[in-house]
Amino acid sequence: MKTTLKLTAIAAMSAFILTGCATQDKSAEADAQLQQQAVLGLNWIQQSGEYQALSYQAYNAAKVAFDHAKVKKGKKKAVVVDLDETMLDNSPYAGWQVQNNKPFDGKDWTRWVDARQSGVVPGAVEFNNYVNTHGGKMFYVSNRKDSNEKAGTIDDMKRLGFNGVEDSAFYLKKDKSPKAARFEEIEKQGYEIVVYVGDNLDDFGDEIYGKQNAERRDFVAQNKAKFGKTFIVLPNPNYGGFEGGLAKDYFKGDSSSKVKARLGAIKAWDGK
């Protein structure tokens, strides 16, 4: 009887271990699948002339918009920009994720920022320095963390040739991701924001923060006259608010659920 009980216990434990291993294997497989889906977009950012052309095009439009913008009497001219994939190129970090099948992790991201190896988005330095030397002021409103990612960010930007990157120009994330409150802080200092530059619709306000893609597309349609004038968009196929807009609670799910949501959102020909 004791032998039977021992064998039963061993069998149960073995089944538990095997189930756990299978779950871990499926999780690792989903992590890998999620990262491999980013490969072509990453190739496009790092290798294509089209990505560079679109970036220059965006900053050329931003310069024209800045030059033509008028501010109210007594106000100072300001431009608000996002940082990641707007001014700074983090595609090597994305490459590390792909090669190691690593989903986004805040600690890994901070290590990347600390490494001070960001690249520059084409046209960003020239636009930044033009604004700061032609009667405007650049403000960097980013969800990099204010507490432990500001120093590495400033060092990187100085290394890359950005001027005007003193501490007071940075409005990084302290507690909340939405940016409208930080825009208001800038305006309270006597500035009028005439141009917003970003790779994510959330860089232009909070109206559609966390919303689904249908609502995000509606926002674009309602504000189409502002794009290329007040709102300047940089290309970024790899991540952003659009990803969370694929499904409700998308970012609360694991890699498997994200893969499912991505595939489920595709519109496809039936072959007939």
Question: What is each PLM-predicted segment?
Answer:
Residues 4-7, 14, 19-81, 248-249, ...:
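Non-catalytic pre-domain segments flanking phosphatase-related domains
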Residues 25-32, 150-272:
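C-terminal cap/substrate-recognition subdomain and adjoining C-terminal extension
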Residues 44-55, 110-118, 139-145, 171-173:
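Second-shell loop/turn segments in exported
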Residues 67, 71, 92-93, 129-137, ...:
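Sec-exported extracytoplasmic/periplasmic mature domains
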Residues 70, 90, 241-244:
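Short, solvent-exposed loop/turn elements at domain surfaces
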Residues 72-78, 87-119:
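Active-site neighborhood of HAD-like aspartate-dependent phosphohydrolases
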Residues 78-81, 88-89, 137-142, 169-171, ...:
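Structural recognition of the beta-strand scaffold that forms the well-ordered cores
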Residues 85, 124-157, 199:
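Substrate-recognition element of Asp-dependent hydrolases with the DxDx(T/V) motif
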